[in-house]
Swiss-Prot record:
Protein name: TELO2-interacting protein 1 homolog
Species for this entry: Homo sapiens
Compositional bias (Basic and acidic residues): 842-852
Associated clinical condition: Neurodevelopmental disorder with microcephaly and movement abnormalities: An autosomal recessive disorder characterized by global developmental delay, impaired intellectual development with language impairment ranging from delayed speech to non-verbal, and delayed walking with an abnormal gait. Affected individuals may show hypotonia or hypertonia with spasticity, ataxia, and choreoathetoid movements. Most patients have microcephaly, non-specific dysmorphic features and short stature. Additional variable features include ocular defects, seizures, brain malformations, and skeletal defects.
InterPro entries the record matches: ARM-like, ARM-type_fold, TELO2-interacting_protein_1, Tti1, TTI1_rpt
Length: 1089
């Protein structure tokens, strides 16, 4: 709070200080004065303003050299006084302005003085404070012609500082001060709004500075990006505000044709400018050059705030100077249109706001409306578009397409004037087709196969994102920037929204038919045209535009859909028909013992991958992409039509399901995504809901097409996809079709077996999922290595049981005799015995009908029929079919596990072929067959005991013994070979099989002998773990023999006889010396304790 509130009190305090400063001009005296001033109120300072200013001004005007520090102190003190008071006299304002400006001028060199940065900053702030302190209209009286030389000097001084100084702080301060001098200050209520006469007077005055200001600011704006965005933003703002004020159409039209004689001295009169038509024309031409240069630089500036200020520049100049800067209209509009799709949302929003403003104001540039200028620009751009797309880099393409998109947004429905020109439409379509050409040389697209039918499963929850957000990533020949593709899609959508849809669809359909080279690009464009025509996600700047009629849109979609799904465009070659030719090479060394490494498999893969020339791969890639684009199109059509797409489901759903079952992974994924788009559009909760609701139509189509399989070879895939994505409610509907499939398989087993077996696999997988077995019929044997290894930390259950009773022994012997009969092949006796022991069902005493077995459930009947076919196909010459058949057979056993009377006879039939697969087939088939063996052992173990011990166990044991030395010597790469995987699978499966089949002592010894060598630490770690799991299972069957066998390998303790009459026990492993088996044996013995 001020101490001295009245002028009298303040004068008494300030007078001695002012007198002292007048006598002696030192920094200390100035600082003393400023200290005293801070204790005086503003009102008192206002009364004593000139008295206080006198010693300060006297110090500045004293002739002779002065120290910079003194001048800086005086200027800072002067600024403090001006910030607390108002200047109410014009003469004082002008004198102070001159005195402050002179602080930075060197009379000797007639150039800006070489002073410190601190002094420069102080003077700039002083000038700014002085102009703000001008009271009321005094500021306007300052800008009279007589001030022109002094004002010009200050403007030149500030421009020089802004352009040449290295200090960013001084640059920004100089630009802000320049804004104040040109009455462009951002602060509120300064200055007040000007009337027409005042605007004209100031415009005439400022016109003298326009050349210097515009050229200097242009140099600043187009300078190095490193100078900082704030300097460029300030320069841009001063540039367009100055130009739009001086060149404003409203001012220039009031300029009289006869120049009035100025009432000023001759020297000043020479500096003044008369803004007549000739001057406007010449100045406009020069400004056009500068504006083009600014646009070229600023439109690609990395900082968004600079680009945003460019939008303000365009708006200001086009709204205020559309007549005086008529030549700038094109470049300015081009800049604005190019920023419509800027990456910054703030710039996009501002651009759209400005464009709407232009539309509301109906801006006229010269004698042309804005729409006419845009149409001419679009014509010109369409003409040069093919050349630009062919010659520009990615950034150039992005800028050009942004420009095209902006023109389309602005013109709206008026783009039809361009599209109705055949030449321009052809050039536009040629450019789009050219730039959208795909790169189809990637071999991975063909290589990626959907080997596992589980890939057909789709999540029941559909994504909330728009279909085009999930479009498959693709690679183009002529660009790599993903933003360009997004721009191209937006261009096509806007064409579909505003353009004549019938004309565009007909034109691009003609290109679709014209050449295979154009087909993919034309399909992409057609997809986006439909999406745009629906008006979804299209930003409409023209509120009166009428969207395409839904019925017309549906008709157009129907015609495109028919073309997409036609025979010649839907069923294209996407893979080599002989892709399984390498099977004979796989069979070169049959049997388990032949698998020593994976090199033969590698050779086959290499042979297959490079057996066809590159053009064939390119053509297949091209076909794959065409199908994917058409599938994506169906999804986009569904999104565009919404519920109306339900009317097209009859023609669209079946073909899409065919492709969802395609072996090419890319096609299958895109088709599944398309089905999810259809679900969302038509109001279905999930794919399951979609399929179940349309199953009658689909089943009818499958049944009809199976009768003409040669014409419809993809029919089984539809049923396969249906089964993968439905529930048990579908089974009664497809039961007849399944019988048709089996009948057709019997007829075409030598030609179409692969596709039918895939269907059977999907069917059995679905049945296993829909009808799980609820009884306690044994554990599933497909356990991972981790599950097997977990037994190492558990005590065997057999060792934890309570003491065995006499009844347990009796029951054990009875079970043993019964199982012995079964093992000898007495299946019928076993069945009869089971029937005798079963409790007869209760019947009504009055019912005299003979006993009739209840009919088998539908899924059991189907599983039996399928298993019969699989038994016959187990010996197929095609390896891939055999592998699939083994998978199906495994699932059949799972489905039939609760109906032993049906399962056991079929297992008996399948056994010879299964043994052949286990012992004399390719390694992959052996692996798959062993999986089936484990499942059989789990579901009907007693039935397999003798067969397994006789036909399979010797070969398995022999294979393990033979391979053990190889795996012990192998390096880390060995774990990736097929031989290793087969060893691992056998070791993991032997333990559960031995336990489930309850093998005898001799057979258990065979297993133990074969697995002992894998307890060596020289073996791979995973094989050691699997071998330990075998012995953990053997402990449950025969713990005594297992304990003895392990101690024979390594015995950690010496056994002392409990009585001297007993002979000491000598075990081979009791030598005390450790061996390769010690570690694993100790772990296993610990489990037995």
């Amino acid at each position: 709070m001020a101490v001295f509130d009245t002028p009298e009190e303040a004068f008494g305090v300030l007078r001695p200080v002012c007198v002292q400063l007048t006598k002696t001009q030192t920094v200390e005296n100035v600082e003393h004065l400023q200290t005293r001033l801070q204790a005086v109120s503003d009102s008192a300072l206002q009364e004593l303003q000139q008295y206080i200013l006198f010693p300060l001004r006297f110090t500045l005007k004293t002739p002779g050299p002065k120290r910079e520090r003194l001048i800086q102190s005086v200027v800072e003190c002067l600024t403090f006084v001006l910030s607390s008071t108002c200047v109410k006299e014009q003469e004082l304002l002008q004198e102070l302005f001159s005195e402050l400006s002179a602080c930075l001028y060197s009379p000797s060199s007639q150039k800006p003085a070489a002073v410190s940065e601190e002094l420069k900053l102080a003077v700039i702030q002083g000038l700014s404070t002085l102009m703000h302190s001008a009271y009321g209209d005094i500021i306007l009286t300052f800008y009279e012609p007589s001030i022109l030389p002094r004002l010009g000097f200050a403007v030149s001084l500030l421009l020089g500082l802004a352009e040449q100084e290295k200090s960013k702080q001084i640059k920004i301060a100089a630009l802000k001060c320049l804004q104040v001098l040109l009455l462009q200050c951002d602060c509120q209520d300064h200055p007040r709004s000007l009337d027409e006469l005042e605007q004209k007077q100031l415009g005439d005055l400022f016109a003298s500075f326009l050349p210097g200001i515009s050229t200097a600011l242009t140099r600043l704006i187009t300078g190095d990006f490193k100078q900082g965005h704030s300097i460029v933003v300030s320069s841009l703002k001063i540039f367009y505000k100055t130009v739009s004020f001086i060149m404003a159409d409203e001012q220039l039209k009031r300029i009289s044709k006869v120049q009035a004689k100025p009432a000023v001295e001759h020297r000043v009169a020479e500096l003044m400018v008369y803004r007549e038509a000739d001057w406007v024309k010449k100045t406009g031409d020069k400004l056009t050059i500068l504006i083009k240069k600014i646009i070229e630089c600023v439109s690609v500036h990395p900082h968004w705030k600079v680009r945003l200020e460019l939008v303000e520049l365009v708006e200001d100049l086009l709204l205020k100077c559309s007549q005086s800067l008529v030549e700038c209209a094109g470049p300015l509009l081009k800049a604005l249109v190019g920023l419509v799709n800027d990456e910054s949302p703030e710039i996009q929003a501002q651009c759209n706001k400005v464009l709407r403003h232009f539309a509301d104001q109906k801006v006229v540039v010269g004698n042309k409306a804005l729409a006419d200028i845009l149409s001419e620009s679009l014509h010109s751009l369409a003409t040069s578009l093919p050349r630009l797309m062919n010659s520009q880099d990615d950034q150039g393409k992005f800028s050009t397409l942004s420009l095209l998109l902006g023109y389309l947004k602005l013109l709206g429905p008026k783009i039809n004037f361009v599209l109705n020109s055949v030449a321009h439409l052809q050039r536009l379509s040629k450019a789009l087709i050219q730039v959208l050409e795909l790169d189809v040389a990637d071999i991975k697209i063909v290589e990626e196969r959907r080997w596992n039918s589980d890939d057909l499963n789709a999540s029941p929850k559909t994504s909330a994102t728009q279909p085009w957000n999930r479009i498959q990533r693709r690679y183009f020949r002529f660009f790599t920037d993903e933003r360009i593709f997004m721009l191209l899609r937006q261009v096509c959508q806007l064409l579909g929204y505003y353009g004549n849809l019938y004309l565009l669809v007909d034109h691009f359909m003609e290109l679709y038919h014209q050449s295979v080279v154009y087909r993919k690009q034309a399909a992409m464009i057609l997809n986006e045209l439909v999406t745009g025509a629906a008006g979804l996600e299209v930003e409409d700047l023209h509120e009166k535009h009428i969207k395409t009629n839904p019925e017309e849109l549906r008709e157009i979609v129907t015609s495109i859909l028919e073309e997409y799904t036609s025979q010649e465009n839907w069923y294209l070659v996407t893979c080599l028909e002989t892709e399984e030719m390498g099977e004979e090479l796989m069979m070169e060394h049959p049997g388990l013992q032949a698998i020593t490494s994976g090199e033969h498999t590698c050779q086959v893969t290499s042979f297959l991958a490079f057996s066809k020339p590159s053009p064939t791969i390119c053509s297949m890639n091209s076909n794959i992409w065409q199908i994917c684009i058409q599938l994506e199109g169906i999804g986009q059509f569904a999104y565009a039509l919404g519920k109306d797409f339900c009317l097209l489901l009859m023609s669209a759903l079946y073909p899409v399901l065919e492709k969802a079952g395609d072996q090419t992974l890319l096609i299958s994924q895109v088709a599944t995504s398309t089905m999810m788009d259809v679900c969302r559009a038509c109001g279905y909760d999930s794919l399951q809901h979609l399929i179940n609701q349309n199953s009658d139509y689909l089943v009818n189509g499958i049944s009809l097409n199976l009768r003409h399989l040669a014409l419809h070879p993809h029919t089984p895939k539809v049923l396969e996809v249906m089964l993968r994505n439905s529930d048990a409610n579908l089974l009664p509907l497809v039961a007849d079709v399944v019988q048709d499939v089996l009948a057709t398989l019997d007829q075409f087993y030598d030609k179409r077996a692969a596709s039918f077996v895939s269907v059977l696999h999907a069917l059995m997988a679905a049945l296993a999922q829909w009808f799980p077995d609820t009884g306690n019929l044994g554990h599933l044997q497909e356990q991972s290595l981790g599950e097997e290894g977990s037994h190492l930390n558990q005590r065997p259950a057999a060792l934890e049981k309570s003491t065995t009773t006499a009844e347990d022994i009796e029951q054990f012997l009875l079970n043993y005799l019964k199982e012995k009969d079964v093992a000898d092949g007495n299946v019928s006796d076993f069945d009869n015995e089971e029937e005798e022991q079963s409790v007869p069902p209760k019947v009504d005493e009055n019912d005299t009908r003979p006993d009739v077995e209840p009919p088998l459930p539908l899924q059991i009947q189907i599983a039996m029929d399928v298993m019969e076919r699989c038994i016959h196909l187990l010996s197929d010459k095609n390896l891939q079919i055999r592998l699939k058949v083994l998978d199906v057979l495994d699932l059949c056993v799972v489905v039939l596990q609760s109906h032993k009377n049906q399962l056991l006879p079929l297992a008996h039939q399948a056994w010879p072929s299964l043994v052949h697969r286990l012992t004399r087939d390719a390694p992959l088939a052996v692996l798959r067959a062993f999986k089936v063996l484990r499942t059989l052992g789990s579901k009907c173990g007693d039935f397999l005991r003798s067969r397994f011990c006789k036909d399979v166990l010797p070969k398995l044991a022999g294979s393990l013994v033979t391979q053990a030395p190889i795996s012990a010597r192998a390096g880390p790469v060995y774990s990736h070979t097929l031989a290793f995987k087969l060893q691992l699978a056998v070791l993991q499966g032997l333990g559960p099989l031995c336990e489930r089949l309850d093998l005898g002592e001799g057979d258990l010894n065979k297993v133990a002998d074969a697995c002992l060598i894998y307890l060596s630490v020289k073996q791979p770690v995973k094989l050691q773990e699997a071998a330990r799991s075998v012995f953990l299972h053997l402990m449950k069957v025969d713990p005594d023999s297992t304990w003895f066998l392990l101690n024979e390998l390594y015995c950690p303790v010496q056994f002392t006889p409990p009585h001297p009459s007993l002979h000491p026990v000598q075990l081979h492993g009791a030598s005390g010396q450790q061996n390769p088996y010690t570690t694993n044996v100790l772990q296993l013995l610990k489990e037995l304790q």
